[in-house]
A protein has these predicted regions:
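Double-stranded RNA-binding/processing signature
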Residues: 1-77
Length: 77
């Protein structure tokens, strides 16, 4: 049987809590695009790491993309 996939945001949260005893910090800072198809921009940061930016069709989607980029940068994927 295959294990259920853990989403990037959850994976980053677990990593950050285990290593730093802190949650990742997400900052929503921009909404662009037309009203019917907005794009959201969010960044994420954990201690001792660079800030990664995620873009998505919702705030949640943007956070997932930012978390995935940071996990990728940290070679945790």
């Amino acid at each position: 049987s295959t294990l259920p996939q853990i989403d990037s945001k959850t994976k980053l949260q677990e990593y950050s809590l285990k290593k730093y005893k802190e949650l990742p910090k997400y900052t929503f800072y921009k909404k662009t695009g037309p009203q019917h198809r907005p794009m959201f921009k969010t960044d994420v940061q954990i201690p001792d790491s660079k800030i990664m930016i995620g873009i998505g069709t919702s705030k949640k989607n943007a956070q997932q993309n930012a978390a995935r980029k940071l996990l990728d940068f940290l070679n945790i994927l």
